[in-house]
């Protein structure tokens, strides 16, 4: 198969669809990989790192789309890419169709075959390609929350982890899935007083055994949340579909 990796053009997206190590595995299995010039540079992978493992470099996005049977990206295509996608071409990336009607209709119209990372599901209903993004999202949420507690950002001037003689911030995390548990781990590591709430008791038991001792668990009943929310300095909402056991 001919696989193409274009450079991401979505605003502030610096990742790349395939790393050199991934390309090496694909080439070893007999496939051909084309990388757009500087596609990996913002992730720390120069063109030379790709050519060293057997990839070929093409100068433009248009050339990559034209030659590839499958396009591997990180984020969904945006408007300038729509016209480059042809009928039957495979696209492997995060799509999140539910939040983007224009994208959904464009992919239907061009007849491409869209494989959305976020919907790849294992037999146990876990989503292996969504988990890494969720881990990043949870940790970044805590980091951003801590920033917005600062006075220059409009916050109350509270340091998440406190200092000797001053209590740490109280953090309430709603949802104990991958995003929530990573947010809790990050907040706990920064020294906050953390509570993570969920309606899945089995999940809460697991979290109480695996998260640091400054993380408490709470069954997320309406009454308990009404009592808890007014007392916290930072609340992070990471609630996913209740049918997902992850």
PLM features per residue range, with description:
Residues 15, 19, 43, 97-100, ...:
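Generic structural signal for well-ordered, non-membrane alpha-helical segments
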Residues 237-246:
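Single conserved hydrophobic/aromatic residue that forms the stacking wall/gate
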Residues 52-58, 73-75, 151-157, 215-221:
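Short gly/ser/thr-rich secondary-structure transition/capping motifs
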Residues 6-40, 155-232:
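Glycine-rich phosphate/diphosphate-binding loop of Rossmann-like nucleotide-binding domains
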Residues 2-110:
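An N-terminal-biased, well-structured beta-alpha scaffold segment characteristic
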Residues 2, 8, 77-169:
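Glycine/serine-rich phosphate-binding loop and adjoining beta1-alpha1 elements at the start
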Residues 36-37, 60-61, 94-96, 116-121, ...:
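Short beta->alpha connector loops at strand-helix junctions that form conserved
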Residues 68, 232-233:
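An anion/phosphate-binding loop that grips the pyrophosphate of nucleotide cofactors and donors
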């Amino acid at each position: 198969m001919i696989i193409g990796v274009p450079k991401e053009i979505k605003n502030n997206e610096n990742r790349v669809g395939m790393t050199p190590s991934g390309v090496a595995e694909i080439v070893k299995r007999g496939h051909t990989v084309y990388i757009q010039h500087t596609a990996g540079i913002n992730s720390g992978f120069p063109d030379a790192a790709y050519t060293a493992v057997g990839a070929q470099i093409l100068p433009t996005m248009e050339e990559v789309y034209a030659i590839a049977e499958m396009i591997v990206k990180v984020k969904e295509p945006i408007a300038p890419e729509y016209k480059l996608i042809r009928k039957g071409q495979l696209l492997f990336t995060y799509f999140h169709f539910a939040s983007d009607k224009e994208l959904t209709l464009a992919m239907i119209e061009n007849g491409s075959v869209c494989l959305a990372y976020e919907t790849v599901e294992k037999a146990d209903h876990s989503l292996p390609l969504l988990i890494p993004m969720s881990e990043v999202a949870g940790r970044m949420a805590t980091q951003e929350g801590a920033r917005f507690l600062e006075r220059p950002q409009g916050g109350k001037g509270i340091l998440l982890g406190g200092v000797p003689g001053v209590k740490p911030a109280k953090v309430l995390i709603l949802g104990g899935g991958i995003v929530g548990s990573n947010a809790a781990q990050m907040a706990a590591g920064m020294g906050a007083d953390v509570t993570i709430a969920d309606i899945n008791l089995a999940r809460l038991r697991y979290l109480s055994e695996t998260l640091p001792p400054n993380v408490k668990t709470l069954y997320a009943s309406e009454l308990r949340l009404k009592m808890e929310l007014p007392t916290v300095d930072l609340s992070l909402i990471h609630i996913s579909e209740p049918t997902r056991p992850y």
